[in-house]
């Protein structure tokens, strides 16, 4: 009384800081919302026994990891960081995980036992809850779901569901098994108590095979039914985007619900009415009816065949019969096809070109968004080998600037596959500088730039001073030379004559008064110099 059941998923959310630290030690980054989505929605659809509440069973984790790391289109590269972190928590458990990690169970016996196993006291959704010791006077809680190991049904195959036909009478061995069962065992609930589920006899499973399936059937093989709970419908509607906003994500959710819950025709209508608008539902139903194929394997236009495979009115299908179950399987397949076809938008390459890598987005996550845009806005399949070149070019051109520049400079770029480009982009992304390193680099570059600017200013000032000094020197030199010339001109004297040299003709042998070259005409009267008297 008063104790709340702790699941592996809730435990990791309560210790999220430790989970992030473990992911950091694995050189990956995880987000809480995607952690919950992968654990409770994605991984249970892998059909390896992963419960919705999570598990620390190493064998189940290994099986999920194999699915995630599958090559080609069947792999899930965006889920790699999450399963790697979960594996690290299971194989190197911190103190808060150790109570949930059980030792390996002993090897199964060589022959199956005729006595049934006693019911477990834990919840059937997950076998990894902490052991709680009940009080002596407490009554054991009845199990809501009977224990069963029936396999999940693959809706994408044409094989009939693994329901056991209740019609034939039990064999002698079945009677012996029935006699060996406890006499006080209560019969299974009515057919309206469980989701559609059958059970086939399986050999004793080894320790690596999980028996934790979400859907079960009664021990007598009678199909049981549970309608959707209002809380499930509410959570699915409020925790996912609308079909018009993100048809791929909502289609994946409905596909996982169809695979795990195997709803009836009424359940499908309730699911569509809750998750889709009226217009979206009509579009999905129309596309689903277009996908009905005739006997020749081609889409048919015959109304009777379309209404028989995908009726719009409530059909009379009994899920307790093989024929009714086959109708439901085909109906769910057509419904998935209708969701996928209705989710395709008109061709708009501008939308694809608008998908660019975020500053802190990994190349793998960016590639997934790019492929989703191709599926949604173009008629091309990005997984088609013929479209690999287009997707590769979009990946290079729309990557972050630093990654795109380095990818464009790769040697022999034409021979690189999309996987090679993603690996190179991951290397570049992981070698990026941290925000602290970037801040330090910007600070250092700013200081260097300021230092260069100061040095340039000082050099310019020195050059200006040198030019000014040179001009001043020229000016002073001009002034000094002019003064020297003036001084030399003022001190100029007549050239000296020899004793017998004529001052007029510069010839020797006579003086100027006797110079023959000097004109001898009468001299004119000298002009008298008028002197001014004081009276004047």
UniProtKB/Swiss-Prot annotation:
Q: Where is this motif: PTAP/PSAP motif?
A: 109-112
The residue ranges flagged as biased composition, category Basic and acidic residues, are 432-464, 484-517
Coiled coil regions in record = 436-476
User: Which positions are lipidated as N-myristoyl glycine?
Assistant: 2
Keyword Ribonucleoprotein carried by entry:
no
UniProt region (Disordered), positions on chain: 112-196, 202-221, 432-536
Keywords, A to Z, come to: Capsid protein, Coiled coil, Host cell membrane, Host cytoplasm, Host endosome, Host membrane, Host-virus interaction, Lipoprotein, Membrane, Metal-binding, Myristate, Phosphoprotein, RNA-binding, Ubl conjugation, Viral budding, Viral budding via the host ESCRT complexes, Viral matrix protein, Viral nucleoprotein, Viral release from host cell, Virion, Zinc, Zinc-finger
Q: How is it modified after translation?
A: RNA-binding phosphoprotein p12 is phosphorylated on serine residues.
User: Which biological processes are named by the entry's GO terms?
Assistant: viral budding via host ESCRT complex
Q: What is this protein called?
A: Gag polyprotein
Organism annotation: Cas-Br-E murine leukemia virus
Gene symbol here is: gag
């Amino acid at each position: 009384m008063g104790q709340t059941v702790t699941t592996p998923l809730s435990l990791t959310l309560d210790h999220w800081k430790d989970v992030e630290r473990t992911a950091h030690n694995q050189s990956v980054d995880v987000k809480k919302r995607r952690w919950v989505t992968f654990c409770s929605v994605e991984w249970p659809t892998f059909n390896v026994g992963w419960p919705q509440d999570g598990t620390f069973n190493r064998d189940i984790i290994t099986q999920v990891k194999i699915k995630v790391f599958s090559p080609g289109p069947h792999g899930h590269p965006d889920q790699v960081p999450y399963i790697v972190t979960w594996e690290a928590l299971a194989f190197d458990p911190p103190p808060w995980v150790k109570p949930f990690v059980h030792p390996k169970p002993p090897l199964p016996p060589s022959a199956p036992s005729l006595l049934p196993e006693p019911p477990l006291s834990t919840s059937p959704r997950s076998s990894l809850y902490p052991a709680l010791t009940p009080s002596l006077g407490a009554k054991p809680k009845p199990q809501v779901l009977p224990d069963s190991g029936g396999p999940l049904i693959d809706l994408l195959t044409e094989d009939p569901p693994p329901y056991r036909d209740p019609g034939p009478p039990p064999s002698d061995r079945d009677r012996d098994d029935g006699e060996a069962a406890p006499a006080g065992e209560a019969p299974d609930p009515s057919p309206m108590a469980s989701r559609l589920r059958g059970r086939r006899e399986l050999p004793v499973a080894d320790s690596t095979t999980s028996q934790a399936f979400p859907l079960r059937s009664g021990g007598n093989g009678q199909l049981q039914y549970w309608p959707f709970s209002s809380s499930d419908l509410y959570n699915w509607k409020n925790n996912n985007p609308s079909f018009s906003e993100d048809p791929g994500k909502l289609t994946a959710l409905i596909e996982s619900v169809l695979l795990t819950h195997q709803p009836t025709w009424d359940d499908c209508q309730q699911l569509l009415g809750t998750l889709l608008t009226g217009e979206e539902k009509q579009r999905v139903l129309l596309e689903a009816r277009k996908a009905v194929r005739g006997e020749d394997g081609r889409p048919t236009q015959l109304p009777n065949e379309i209404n028989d495979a995908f009726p719009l009115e409530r059909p009379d299908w009994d899920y307790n019969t093989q024929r009714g179950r086959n109708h439901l399987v085909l109906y769910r397949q057509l419904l998935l096809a209708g969701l996928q076809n209705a989710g395709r938008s008109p061709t708009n390459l501008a939308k694809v070109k608008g998908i660019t890598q975020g500053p802190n987005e990994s190349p793998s996550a960016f590639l997934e968004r790019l492929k989703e845009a191709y599926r949604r806005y173009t008629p091309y399949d990005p997984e088609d080998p013929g479209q690999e070149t287009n997707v590769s070019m979009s990946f290079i051109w729309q990557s972050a600037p630093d990654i795109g520049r380095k990818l464009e400079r790769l040697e022999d770029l034409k021979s690189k596959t999309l996987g090679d480009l993603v690996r190179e982009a991951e290397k570049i992304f992981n070698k990026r500088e941290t925000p602290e390193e970037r801040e330090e680099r910007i600070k250092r570059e700013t200081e260097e730039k300021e230092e260069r600017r100061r040095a340039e200013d000082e050099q310019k000032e020195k050059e200006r001073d040198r030019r000014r000094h040179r001009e001043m020197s020229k000016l002073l030199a001009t002034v000094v030379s002019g003064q020297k010339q003036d001084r030399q001109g003022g001190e100029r004297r007549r050239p000296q004559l020899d004793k017998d040299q004529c001052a007029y003709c510069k010839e020797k042998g006579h003086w100027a008064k006797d110079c023959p070259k000097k004109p001898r005409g009468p001299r004119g009267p000298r002009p008298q110099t008028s002197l001014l008297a004081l009276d004047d």
